[in-house]
Design a protein with these regions (language model features):
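Outer-membrane beta-barrel porins/channels
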Residues: 1-184
Length: 184
């Protein structure tokens, strides 16, 4: 369906009044805490995992305007969303371990699958992270490094023919974070 071709000669004012339903999401999480063998009442660390289901195809736009042309545009947009995107399952796992004294180390990974129905579009994210933290009763400081590896299909515009009108994007995003907090 060619959404843009049907509306190419129609110009709407720069102000829109619509309602958007964001994708539904459900998460199942689990954690396991383990104790220090020499001090069983003190936790040594934990492992946690999440499985997340996201209904990208369920995103919807609704016009708050009764103008039939505007309503028709949003109906067509919803049709394109429903036929372009799919439901997806994402995975996350992480762990934190108390080292000695007030020091802690953590590591994690996440995988976010492709939201596109068309398997030809390679789109996903893979995240690796690690960090250290120092905590006292009143203060804490955390240092984290996170590397996000992204694959995506970038569409600058949509055409009726689907041949090669998108760009395969691959990228890495390396981030360093420092956090400081005061407990009161």
């Amino acid at each position: 369906y060619d959404l843009m071709n049907n509306y190419k000669n129609n110009f709407y004012p720069a102000s829109y009044d619509y309602t958007m339903t964001t994708p539904a999401k459900a998460i199942v999480s689990s954690s396991y805490f383990f104790a220090n063998p020499s001090k069983p009442t003190q936790p040594l660390g934990f492992i946690s995992a999440d499985i997340e289901w996201v209904k990208y195809a369920g995103t919807r736009f609704y016009s708050n305007d009764n103008n039939q042309e505007v309503v028709s545009y949003y109906n067509d947009l919803n049709y394109v969303i429903k036929n372009t995107y799919q439901n997806n399952i994402n995975f996350k796992i992480g762990s934190e371990v108390k080292l000695n004294g007030n020091w802690m180390a953590r590591a994690g990974t996440a995988f976010y699958g492709s939201p596109y129905k068309d398997g030809g579009f390679k789109a996903s994210q893979f995240v690796l992270s690690g960090g250290i933290g120092y905590r006292t009763e009143k203060h804490f400081i955390d240092l984290t490094i996170m590397n996000t590896m992204v694959k995506d299909a970038i569409f600058p515009y949509r055409l009726t023919e689907k041949s090669s009108y998108y760009a395969d994007f691959k990228g890495n995003n390396l981030m360093f974070n420092i956090g400081y907090g005061i407990r009161f």
